[in-house]
């Protein structure tokens, strides 16, 4: 596969994953679709750190767009040198995207490990923090959270989605980093294939 076609494929995948991260993070702000918990201090710190919005979302959107542009044959920098410049930009953007995806992964992993902030026995707090993530396997503990209702499965589902998406983003940004580096030094094979004889 040519470096340009690979870049375009990776870029479109990254854009899709960053949209998944943004939506998942937005849903974490409204447990069970109820906005009444958002205005108070009843959401966990990991929700407010916006790992999915900032890290897996905006910081990965830049390399996604750069990869799509590097894979295209746009008017900006036509020819061999222009495509190599877009590939070079994609190298730096991909490194930036890896950092964003790592941020999303670390925040989401901490959110899974610590559990949600919830009301249990009349007290708000991180009641699953001391279990070191063991609450994930014991669903009977999930019902002990009185408010927000069903917050544990909500957080587990969305943080797990963010962990999976950010892992894929790290892999795809790494692939694009290598692909774009090859594209900078070797160029794009499509130029030779697409020219009429």
Swiss-Prot record:
UniProt-reported outcome of changing residue 125 to A: Disrupts arginine-binding
Q: In which tissues is it expressed?
A: Intestine. Overexpressed in pancreatic cancers.
Q: Where in the cell is it found?
A: Lysosome membrane; Cell membrane
Single GO term (MF): arginine binding
Return the annotated region ranges for Interaction with MTOR and CASTOR1: 91-197
Protein residues bound to L-arginine: 124-129
The impact of changing residue 129 to A is: Disrupts arginine-binding
Sequence ranges on the Cytoplasmic membrane side: 1-9, 68-90, 179-197
> What biological-process GO terms show up in the record?
regulation of G1/S transition of mitotic cell cycle
What InterPro entries does this protein map onto? L6_membrane
Q: Which residues are glycosylated?
A: 138, 155
Q: Name one GO cellular component term.
A: membrane
Q: How does it sit in the membrane?
A: Multi-pass membrane protein
Record's Pfam families? L6_membrane
Q: What is its main location?
A: membrane
Protein task: Acts as a lysosomal membrane arginine sensor. Forms a complex with MTOR and SLC38A9 on lysosomal membranes in an arginine-regulated manner, leading to arginine efflux which enables the activation of mTORC1 which subsequently leads to RPS6KB1 and EIF4EBP1 phosphorylations. Facilitates cell cycle G1/S phase progression and the translocation of the CDK4-CCND1 complex into the nucleus. CDKN1B and RHOA/ROCK signaling activity are involved in TM4SF5-mediated acceleration of G1/S phase progression.
Q: How does it assemble?
A: Interacts with MTOR; the interaction is positively regulated by arginine and is negatively regulated by leucine. Interacts with SLC38A9. Interacts with SLC7A1; the interaction is negatively regulated by arginine. Interacts with CASTOR1; the interaction is positively regulated by leucine and is negatively regulated by arginine.
- What protein family is recorded? Belongs to the L6 tetraspanin family.
State what protein this is by name.
Transmembrane 4 L6 family member 5
Species of provenance = Homo sapiens (Human)
Gene name in the database record: TM4SF5
């Amino acid at each position: 596969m040519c470096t340009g076609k690979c870049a375009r494929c990776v870029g479109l995948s990254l854009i899709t994953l960053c949209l998944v991260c943004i939506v998942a993070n937005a849903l974490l702000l409204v447990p069970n679709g109820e906005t009444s918990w958002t205005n108070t201090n009843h959401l966990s710190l990991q929700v407010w750190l916006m790992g999915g919005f900032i890290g897996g979302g905006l910081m990965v959107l830049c390399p996604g767009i750069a990869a799509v542009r590097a894979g295209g044959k746009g008017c900006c920098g036509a020819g061999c040198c222009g495509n190599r410049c877009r590939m070079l930009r994609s190298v730096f953007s991909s490194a930036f995207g890896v950092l964003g995806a790592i941020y999303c992964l670390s925040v989401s992993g901490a959110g899974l490990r610590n559990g949600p902030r919830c009301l249990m026995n009349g007290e708000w707090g991180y009641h699953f923090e001391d279990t070191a993530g063991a609450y994930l396997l014991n669903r009977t503990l999930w019902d002990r959270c009185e408010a927000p209702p069903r917050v544990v499965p909500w957080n587990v589902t969305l943080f797990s989605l963010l962990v999976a998406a950010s892992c894929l983003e790290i892999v795809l940004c790494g692939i694009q980093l290598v692909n774009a580096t090859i594209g900078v030094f070797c160029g794009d094979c499509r130029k030779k294939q697409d020219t009429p004889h």
